[in-house]
Amino acid sequence: MEIDILSLFPDYFASPLQATILGRAIKQGALSVRSRDIREFGLGKWKQVDDSPYNGEGMLLMAEPVVQAIRSIRRKKSKVIYLSPQGQLLSAKKSRELASCSHLVLLCGHYEGIDERALTAEVDEEISIGDYVLTNGCAAALVLVDALARFIPGILGNQESAEYDSLENGLLEGPQYTRPRVFEGESVPEVLLCGDHQKIADWRKQVSLERTRERRPDLYLQYFYGNSACLSTQEDLPRIEVVSPKTFSVVLEVQDLRKAKKFYSRMFGKECWDGDKLFLLGKTSLYLQQTKETRGPTTVFIELETDHDFVRFLKRWEMLGGELGEQGTGGFPLRQVFDLDGHIWVVSCVQK
């Protein structure tokens, strides 16, 4: 695999790419990483690469030097990635996907960013390593290289280690132990010493689930959602309890009252209806009002009692034709979903 990194600081990558597993992989020829200086494509005598933006403060990388730098190394099957906090969050799944590419061009951001026209013209995908801002994109490029390199055959001494690491299967890895058997009075779990591979595998899976549920409930719910059985009938869908300590009513404008009522009947149960009024729980009510033209989407906030209800809600919503939106960040079970008329439901789960 070949990777070209475009930045203003090509020397930044020298030491990390010469040491550790990455350095060994490069020496063995399993991976090729080259660092290029965008300034080589700067304009004029002084090789200018940045200028002040029209609509803000600071400096931006200019479109022309960036575009020329990319085109100088881009090939027919190259994939150009811009490291940006606005991009898709890097994951083990994405790293594995990128490891199958033959040639990557990593574009590092500097200053306040890059002229949008360069991104539109040349960038295939934007990737973020987290919801924070760095002084430049060089560190993010190194993170991406390291993350995807682990999935390139021959780079890790034991390829199986990549398969069992945290997040590879959507869960956090469980605790690890080595010799001695007892340290400061604390023993290695007996199951790891029994020699029964199936029991050990079952134990690892269980502690992995427990650790993920405790430390990263967002990942736990995402895993649970992705691996739960597909629900196909109304009988399979038990009543979802909605937490509502206060009285409130919501009016939703819909273009097809019959269709909308059928959707919400299957979501919350036919027994909850009184005419065109839906009782979600106790004093909470939802009114449907048919209109030819809606005044725009309404946002409804709903909190569910358990994480199982949260997952069932999302499964049912998608099965009935609703759309799933963005997943919340920060470890909190939160998801935006859209009904058949485009109204927004912000769904969360009680934190216990």
Swiss-Prot record:
**A cellular component annotation (GO) from this entry:** cytosol
This entry's Enzyme Commission designation comes to 2.1.1.228
Task: List, alphabetically, the InterPro entries matched.
Answer: Alpha/beta_knot_MTases, Glyas_Bleomycin-R_OHBP_Dase, tRNA_m1G_MeTrfase_C_sf, tRNA_m1G_MeTrfase_TrmD, tRNA_m1G_MTases_N, tRNA_MeTrfase_TRMD/TRM10
Know the name of this protein? tRNA (guanine-N(1)-)-methyltransferase
UniProt binding sites for S-adenosyl-L-methionine = 109, 129-134
Could you tell me where this protein is found in the cell? Cytoplasm
Q: How does it assemble?
A: Homodimer.
Provide any one GO MF term from the record.
tRNA (guanine(37)-N1)-methyltransferase activity
By sequence similarity, the record places it as follows: Belongs to the RNA methyltransferase TrmD family.
Where does the UniProt entry say this protein principally localizes? cytoplasm
**Source species, domain of life:** Bacteria
Its biological purpose is as follows: Specifically methylates guanosine-37 in various tRNAs.
Q: Does the keyword Transferase apply?
A: yes
Its EC top class is transferase
Looking up Pfam families in the UniProt record yields: tRNA_m1G_MT
What reaction is this protein's catalytic activity? guanosine(37) in tRNA + S-adenosyl-L-methionine = N(1)-methylguanosine(37) in tRNA + S-adenosyl-L-homocysteine + H(+)
What gene name is given for the protein in this entry? trmD
Organism field: Chlamydia trachomatis serovar L2 (strain ATCC VR-902B / DSM 19102 / 434/Bu)
The residues that cross the membrane are: none
This protein's UniProt keywords: Cytoplasm, Methyltransferase, S-adenosyl-L-methionine, Transferase, tRNA processing
Which SUPFAM superfamilies does this one have?
alpha/beta knot, Glyoxalase/Bleomycin resistance protein/Dihydroxybiphenyl dioxygenase
Give one GO biological process term.
tRNA N1-guanine methylation
HAMAP family per the record?
Answer: TrmD
